[in-house]
Amino acid sequence: MAKIIAFDEEARRGLERGLNALADAVKVTLGPKGRNVVLEKKWGAPTITNDGVSIAKEIELEDPYEKIGAELVKEVAKKTDDVAGDGTTTATVLAQALVREGLRNVAAGANPLGLKRGIEKAVEAVTVRLLETAKEIDTKEQIAATAGISAGDPSIGELIAEAMDKVGKEGVITVEESNTFGLQLELTEGMRFDKGYISAYFATDPERQEAVLEDAYILLVSSKISTVKDLLPLLEKVIQSGKPLVIIAEDVEGEALSTLVVNKIRGTFKSVAVKAPGFGDRRKAQLADIAILTGGEVISEEVGLSLETAGLELLGQARKVVITKDETTIVEGAGDPEAIAGRVAQIRAEIENSDSDYDREKLQERLAKLAGGVAVIKAGAATEVELKERKHRIEDAVRNAKAAVEEGIVAGGGVALLQSAPALDDLKLEGDEATGANIVRVALEAPLKQIAFNAGLEPGVVAEKVRNLPAGHGLNASTNEYGDLLEAGINDPVKVTRSALQNAASIAALFLTTEAVVADKPEKAGAPVGDPTGGMGGMDF
């Protein structure tokens, strides 16, 4: 495909137009009085949202240079969302302010590389100041306030705080759509995976259609079990111990399954067979997780273990195992706490090194099952459009609350950024580097000014007033009053604020140092293909 190339000011201005188009659509959502944006979908109902990254992802511009500019800012929003789960609109507003000020200085003759170094040093100084002023979050009320602000609904904040209180900061909180109106919280004790018993005959409670085994042995096998002779030596040992047995394998079929079922019905021996969760390598990893949690071993030819020679020492144990037709829950596995902690650390390292959102999500679920628990928030609403929007808000708020617990909180409403500007006074910079630091100083005011503008106030007046207030005091845009924001429960996780600034500065530096842009040449729309037969003139259909 043919390419088109733009140089110097033309290249940078083309990128800036794309950035501005995207940022202008996103920034209307900032603050408690921000508005929503309606996104058309090819299929189904349109989506109404105030989430920066969701809006950014939908924007596709026609002009090739503008398109590249918009894509660069999408990267800011996406990276901030990946790292902190919120702050995407703030990051976009900061990027726009940094680029606008930076390009003005480049046009006036400043050296882009000098500006880049100045911006980087200034951002580092502000980040250090933010982390120094961050306040640790330790109460349920503070978590509720943080999550409530992110979701724009205090009741959602309270529910998330309750969920985090129950499952711990390592636990997973998932959000599901509900058919009933309102919000519900469901908690899962122990490790749960979405595979149930292979045969309904295994149920110990026919009314509830579930099998409950107390103080059970757990046999983990990576392959299929079909012949009973493989299983018999081990079954005899388990029967002698007097404990029930849960078999988790790729599959249990044929005479092996019928033997287990017959013994269960006769009351000779209580057991349940369950298919292992997942597929391929993911199945192996999940079986290994269960083995570590229960203190057992996965019987696999890969590690030289076979069913015929297996003894009780290779079986895992748990205080209780509850199995329904769809899922299995293992409560209080007998695994070594040190081994579990080691496995948790290993999974956490895999999460950090993973590039795929899907893989990261699956690893996060495995981490939660080992380290904490699982809480499910079920959200319902009157219409499908409202339900989607509400679910998205809750998911953002959950990640926001986790970020707050991780690194602490600072005053919200754009105040923490503006009041971190004095950190730049200590930098001894000269020339273009000093100009770069000043670009950051101007940009630090942008989020607060946008919040004030969306609330119908004069941005410049608000920024000047907040600059002269004590640390942590600022504008409460929902009431248009000034006061102590942390006390009023208006806070942001420092991880969100820090990530927004760092990611915005990273993209801004790329914009300023760009000297040429190479883009695909737009194809001209061809004339519609005519009817080769010439049609059938005079015919009236």
Swiss-Prot record:
The keyword Acetylation does not apply. ATP binds at T29, L30, G31, P32, D86, G87, T88, T89, T90, G413, D492. It catalyses: ATP + H2O + a folded polypeptide = ADP + phosphate + an unfolded polypeptide. SUPFAM superfamilies: GroEL apical domain-like (SSF52029), GroEL equatorial domain-like (SSF48592), GroEL-intermediate domain like (SSF54849). GO terms for molecular function: ATP binding; ATP-dependent protein folding chaperone; isomerase activity; unfolded protein binding. Keywords: ATP-binding, Chaperone, Cytoplasm, Isomerase, Nucleotide-binding. The keyword Isomerase applies. It comes from the Bacteria. Its main location: cytoplasm. GO terms for biological process: protein refolding. One of its GO terms (cellular component) is cytoplasm. Its EC number is 5.6.1.7. It is found in: Cytoplasm. CDD domains: GroEL. It holds the Pfam family Cpn60_TCP1. NCBIfam families: GroEL, PRK00013.1, PRK12849.1, PRK12850.1, PRK12851.1. Belongs to the chaperonin (HSP60) family. Forms a cylinder of 14 subunits composed of two heptameric rings stacked back-to-back. Interacts with the co-chaperonin GroES. Together with its co-chaperonin GroES, plays an essential role in assisting protein folding. The GroEL-GroES system forms a nano-cage that allows encapsulation of the non-native substrate proteins and provides a physical environment optimized to promote and accelerate protein folding. This is Chaperonin GroEL 1. It comes from Rhodococcus jostii (strain RHA1). The lineage of its organism: Bacteria, Bacillati, Actinomycetota, Actinomycetes, Mycobacteriales. The gene is groEL1.
